[in-house]
Amino acid sequence: MFTGLVEAIGVVKDVQGTIDNGFAMKIEAPQILDDCHTGDSIAVNGTCLTVTDFDRYHFTVGIAPESLRLTNLGQCKAGDPVNLERAVLSSTRMGGHFVQGHVDTVAEIVEKKQDGEAIDFTFRPRDPFVLKYIVYKGYIALDGTSLTITHVDDSTFSIMMISYTQSKVIMAKKNVGDLVNVEVDQIGKYTEKLVEAHIADWIKKTQA
């Protein structure tokens, strides 16, 4: 579990293919490795990954084929920056929202414009089904960053990034055409499942 508050920006040092068609990615991030252990969970661009090796300055994670299909991590190469967040502790302040690190899809930046010191981004998701879980003023995690929806329609959604956040995450430097990882707020998914089950149960009872 994560909060969507990025702790550090790491730098990809190496990416190697693995025999299971996945990747092994080595990331430089000494600022978050003081209490690192093999098996720890770290969100990389919002994707929950497991630490397989580490030293004082770097850690390595394995990226499964499913994660490569659903995320933008397959585009990462040596020198690229990535958002990083360690899994929450019981003492962690929940300053963002509950983020699982299970990316639903990617979205393309279709508009980026300055609004005073803030930046307005508009995105088109690759898989439109996620739009039903996105609501005005609701939460969304983009590349692991907890953000608030400012607009949503039948094909796109928008957020505003304040100047403070711009200096803490990688998305501020992304441009039109770039991809971001999308994880919608889980509350919508749970609500949908409960409602569907309730309706199905009601139909069975009325037809009995």
Curated annotation (Swiss-Prot):
Keyword entries, A-Z: Repeat, Riboflavin biosynthesis, Transferase
Lumazine-binding repeat feature ranges: 1-97, 98-195
- Annotated residues that bind 2,4-dihydroxypteridine 2 are located at C48, L49, T50, G62, I63, A64, P65, E66, S67, G101, H102, V103, K137
Q: Pfam families, per this entry?
A: Lum_binding
Under the cellular component aspect of Gene Ontology, which terms does the record hold?
A: cytosol; nucleus
User: What S-S linkages are listed for this chain?
Assistant: none
Question: A single Gene Ontology molecular function, please?
Answer: riboflavin synthase activity
Functional description taken from the UniProt entry: Catalyzes the dismutation of two molecules of 6,7-dimethyl-8-ribityllumazine, resulting in the formation of riboflavin and 5-amino-6-(D-ribitylamino)uracil.
Stated name of the protein:
Riboflavin synthase
The species this protein belongs to is Schizosaccharomyces pombe (strain 972 / ATCC 24843)
